[in-house]
Swiss-Prot record:
Organism phylogeny: Bacteria, Pseudomonadati, Pseudomonadota, Alphaproteobacteria, Acetobacterales
Binding site for ATP: G35, D36, R37, G38, T39, G40, K41, S42
Gene: bchI
GO annotation, biological process: bacteriochlorophyll biosynthetic process; photosynthesis
UniProt miscellaneous comment: Substitution of the magnesium ion by a zinc ion in this bacteria has been shown to occur after this step of bacteriochlorophyll biosynthesis.
Top enzyme category: ligase
Name of the protein in question: Magnesium-chelatase 38 kDa subunit
EC number, UniProt record: 6.6.1.1
SMART domains, sorted: AAA (SM00382)
Length: 345
């Protein structure tokens, strides 16, 4: 079954840009897309899976270990490297779904019962966290996820490692992934501890523009009638965007942040009253990725402005005297701050 092309998605520019930024800068902390039902959140994530470039991994490794990252190899790859046998291959960057009904064993991994019964061997069967290593872990309706799984994800996200202690097994393996969550806020709030772990938070709304709504329906109908033909129509656009991603990934280490931009980012977070320093760090990482996507090697005010709402809206304290949306508060603070900076120059 063909996947809907990423470049065929109409509108939702903030969500699409956030996913591209998280692809270029995986250490950002992932993307949370909250909004109305039927607005393309799940479609965008699955379309991203087909768009992503390949990566180099240890051949045959169940965790897609990076052969160049010696300190982050799984136990099997460390043993193979010590024996001098560490061949590599190109594989697709994984995008793994974590369903709401998943058990803890399915998420973290468990004893391979088939091998245990057949051969009497205690072998580990990797879970979803292992499959998502160096890729993306997607959770739809993340605000409905069970609390014990939320705690588990927080632990793994903080350490970058999955520790399994059960049924006589004691094992740890790398588990670094970009977390993408989606949901409808009407169905429940997200726990603050998990909310703060997301690098970017985007608001996804039902389109109100008539022409845009018509184009969404037209494209979806065309895709369902002829998936192969519709996919071919956007093949060139998909290839061009994939090349842009690869170029941005290579450019990212060369992107610098001037002192003036660093000061602006810090002032913006102070003005908005964000807790801790995670806001500034995320803001700068996102701005660097935005610059890399644009082909620039220096972060500017425009890059900062482009990513600030998504990087900061979920870090604001609720103000009972200001009922405006968090994104609007960020926009107001930016407008005031950048106008002051312009006057100072």
């Amino acid at each position: 079954m063909a996947l809907y092309p990423f470049t065929a998605i109409v509108g939702q520019t903030e969500m699409i840009r956030a996913m591209l930024i998280a692809t270029v800068e995986p250490t950002l902390g992932g993307v949370l897309a909250f909004g109305d039902r039927g607005t393309g959140k799940s479609t965008a994530v699955r379309a991203l899976a087909a768009l992503l470039p390949t990566m180099r991994a240890v051949a045959g490794c169940r965790y897609h270990c990076d052969p160049a990252a010696r300190s982050a190899l799984c136990p099997e790859c460390r043993n193979r490297r010590a024996a001098g046998r560490l061949a590599s291959e190109r594989v697709r960057i994984p995008v793994v779904d974590l369903p709401l009904g998943a058990t803890e064993d399915r998420v973290v991994g468990a004893l391979d019962l088939e091998r245990a019964l057949a051969d009497g061997v205690k072998a580990f069967e990797p879970g979803l966290l292992a499959r998502a290593h160096r890729g993306f872990l997607y959770i739809d309706e993340i605000n409905l996820l069970e609390d014990h799984l939320v705690d588990l994800l927080l632990d793994v996200a903080a350490s970058g490692e999955n520790v399994v202690e059960r049924e006589g097994l004691s094992l740890r393996h790398p588990a670094r992934f970009v977390l993408i969550g989606s949901g409808n806020p009407e169905e429940g709030e997200l726990r603050p501890q998990l909310l703060d772990r997301f690098g970017l938070c985007v608001e996804v709304k039902t389109p109100t523009d008539l022409d845009q709504r018509i184009e969404v329906v037209r494209r979806r109908d065309a895709f369902e009638h002829d998936q192969a033909g519709f996919t071919r129509r956007f093949a060139a656009d998909e290839a061009a965007l994939r090349r842009q991603l690869v170029t941005a990934m290579k450019l990212l280490p060369l992107v610098s942040v001037p002192e003036a931009i660093l000061r602006l980012a810090a002032k913006l977070c102070i003005e908005l009253g964000t807790d801790g320093l995670r806001g500034e760090l995320t803001l700068l990482r996102a701005a660097r990725a935005e610059a890399a996507l644009e082909g620039d090697t220096v972060v500017t005010e425009s890059h900062l402005r482009a990513v600030a709402p998504a990087a900061l809206r979920h870090r604001l304290r609720r103000d009972p005297l200001d009922e405006s949306l968090a994104g609007a508060r960020v926009e107001r603070a930016m407008a005031a701050l950048f106008s002051q900076a312009a006057i100072a120059r």
